[in-house]
Amino acid sequence: MKASPHRPTKALIHLGAIRQNIQQMGAHIPQGTLKLAVVKANAYGHGAVAVAKAIQDDVDGFCVSNIDEAIELRQAGLSKPILILGVSEIEAVALAKEYDFTLTVAGLEWIQALLDKEVDLTGLTVHLKIDSGMGRIGFREASEVEQAQDLLQQHGVCVEGIFTHFATADEESDDYFNAQLERFKTILASMKEVPELVHASNSATTLWHVETIFNAVRMGDAMYGLNPSGAVLDLPYDLIPALTLESALVHVKTVPAGACMGYGATYQADSEQVIATVPIGYADGWTRDMQNFSVLVDGQACPIVGRVSMDQITIRLPKLYPLGTKVTLIGSNGDKEITATQVATYRVTINYEVVCLLSDRIPREYY
């Protein structure tokens, strides 16, 4: 989807806030810990290339989801190590060697498929993924890890790292987290040769389980100033939200009592009301379930009335405002603020999803 720069809807990205968040997190982890910035999914909706360029001197490398995201960074001139967290297709191995990417190895079947196709693995760098309880990709048995490491090294592969991912690091109970940690440690203890880089800490682990950090951390949600737990756990220190979502009033009118708004005529004015239209809708990632949520105009909460359309919403104003008046959907306006977590709570989801769903139609502006 192409960006639409000729309408007032935009996401403002505070790159300085992201850098400050990295520095803040770095000040609370063991000295010498490598910092890997997770910029997958277009840097959680913040813009992968712009974010990576802004923080490249503050981190030791980047993490992405797939090889196409990695290629985008390399072609933009980013030279630091890039770890691809997902499983890559066999055909991607040649690209990984060409662009100097680090691949994730999650199973013996993948290695065997490479060997069956006689793919030249010499010079490839990989990290082994351990499924300690997340249930997605990764080795579960120590014997398989040892076999994989031997096979890879026999064929000229550099097994640089090993990692896992915690399912409940952002929850109040530590029971499952501790069980996962013990499984991971057991596998590490069984290895004849532990790879140089060992990382298990996502944002939540980095924030609330700092004592379990190995020698690298993966900074994701928290790097963008978001609380990985939503409202479950308090942040141990301040982080600055980097994204503001704004638009403006493009149409304002007074409607009589009984007037209806939106598809399905689900909202009917019970008195004379001032109704305004804002050019943002579900095609932009402002989903249909946001009906009745309030946005900010002139420091005042104004409810979304009627269903969210593909391209527009209608809101009820306390009085007439001129066209072009700013509307804040995420961020501060006057003395009020709407956070991504508040939006997520209203949607019964997580703040990760809120920012990731903001579509490419919304231009990102950086400062």
Curated annotation (Swiss-Prot):
Pathway recorded for this protein: Amino-acid biosynthesis; D-alanine biosynthesis; D-alanine from L-alanine: step 1/1
SMART domains: Ala_racemase_C
EC number: 5.1.1.1
Keywords in alphabetical order: Isomerase, Pyridoxal phosphate
Active site: K40, Y263
GO molecular function, one term: pyridoxal phosphate binding
CDD domains (UniProt xref): PLPDE_III_AR
Cofactor (UniProt): pyridoxal 5'-phosphate
InterPro entries (alphabetical): Ala_racemase (IPR000821), Ala_racemase/Decarboxylase_C (IPR009006), Ala_racemase_C (IPR011079), Ala_racemase_N (IPR001608), Ala_racemase_pyridoxalP-BS (IPR020622), PLP-binding_barrel (IPR029066)
Protein's UniProt keywords contain Thylakoid: no
Residues that, per the record, bind substrate: R136, M310
Family annotation (PROSITE patterns): ALANINE_RACEMASE
Residues where N6-carboxylysine is found: K129
Record-listed N6-(pyridoxal phosphate)lysine modification sites: K40
A GO BP entry: D-alanine biosynthetic process
GO CC field: cytosol
Catalytic activity: L-alanine = D-alanine
Family recorded in the similarity comment: Belongs to the alanine racemase family.
Subunit text: Homodimer.
PANTHER family on file: ALANINE RACEMASE (PTHR30511), ALANINE RACEMASE, CATABOLIC-RELATED (PTHR30511:SF0)
Record's function text: Catalyzes the interconversion of L-alanine and D-alanine. May also act on other amino acids.
Protein name: Alanine racemase
Protein encoded by which gene: alr
